[in-house]
């Protein structure tokens, strides 16, 4: 498991190598019709799109499907509960972690990491 450093800003782009994959992540906030801020994520690996516009939720692995071209999964983790991440708490309350393929499989099966 690898923690990806995030800043408490509404929009950010970062480059990180995850399990040998050159990843470009874009985390951004959109205000939805209910007036609440919602985080979304885009991911490119080696300058090739893997997914765009994925909603960021606590505990939801990204990408949702293994055939999208990423080895392993990204997961937002709420360190204080189970709320959807908000930009103001990124890097502290909400952390983004990378799970290797074996860790992602264990996570999907509900096993402790």
What are these regions (language model features)?
Residues 18-37, 87:
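Short, surface-exposed loop and linker segments with low hydrophobicity and enrichment for Pro/Ser/Thr
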Residues 86-113:
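C-terminal charged interaction modules
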Residues 1-26:
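Short, charged/polar N-terminal "headpieces" of proteins
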